[in-house]
Curated annotation (Swiss-Prot):
GO molecular function: large ribosomal subunit rRNA binding; structural constituent of ribosome
GO CC annotation terms, alphabetical: mitochondrial inner membrane; mitochondrial large ribosomal subunit; mitochondrion
Other facts: Present with 3200 molecules/cell in log phase SD medium.
Protein known as: Large ribosomal subunit protein uL11m
Gene that produces this protein: MRPL19
Quaternary context: Component of the mitochondrial large ribosomal subunit (mt-LSU). Mature yeast 74S mitochondrial ribosomes consist of a small (37S) and a large (54S) subunit. The 37S small subunit contains a 15S ribosomal RNA (15S mt-rRNA) and 34 different proteins. The 54S large subunit contains a 21S rRNA (21S mt-rRNA) and 46 different proteins.
Pfam families on file: Ribosomal_L11, Ribosomal_L11_N
Length: 158
């Protein structure tokens, strides 16, 4: 009995408008028998409405006949939170001084910054447009974003 050919799924995070057949795109698709340049042209055309360089998660489905389809998702929550704070990246130890387990960690508490609930709600609206979040309540998405913000050391204020 021969095994039926199956679809292969490749997950990548590519900068909007910056897909090129160089790593990581080229090797990831080339090893599956797909011409990376075809994906790059289509991705760059579909991501033209994003700011250049915004990281866009992509789910590429490669069929047995070496054709492909791909789904673009909304940018990662951490990226959107940092952009709302007008920062490029956070610091290495966001929650120094907070409770870890039963004893407080040493060092002063360092918050990365503060965001209003309005900013969090705007990020939630972006995430709600994503197909995988479309059935979730807005309150649940906001709570999830607040959790990510807390883990990054960002304080959410009303």
């Amino acid at each position: 009995m021969s095994q039926a050919a199956k679809n292969v799924i490749v997950k990548l995070i590519v900068g909007a408008g910056q897909a090129a057949p160089s790593p990581p795109v080229g090797p990831a698709l080339g090893s599956k028998g797909i011409k990376a340049i075809d994906f790059c042209k289509e991705f760059n055309a579909r991501s033209a409405n994003y700011q250049p360089g915004v990281p866009v998660p992509v789910l590429i489905t490669i069929k047995p006949d070496r054709t492909f389809t791909f789904e673009m998702k909304s940018p990662p929550t951490g990226y959107l939170l940092l952009k709302a704070l007008k920062m490029d990246k956070g610091h290495g130890q966001p929650n120094v001084g907070t409770m870890l387990g039963s004893a407080p960690a040493k060092g002063p508490t360092r918050a990365l910054g503060e965001l209003s609930l309005k900013h969090v709600y705007e990020i939630a609206k972006i995430k709600k447009s994503d197909e995988r979040h479309s059935l979730l309540e807005m309150e649940g998405i906001v709570k999830s974003i607040v959790g990510v913000a807390k883990s990054m050391g960002i304080k959410v204020v009303p």
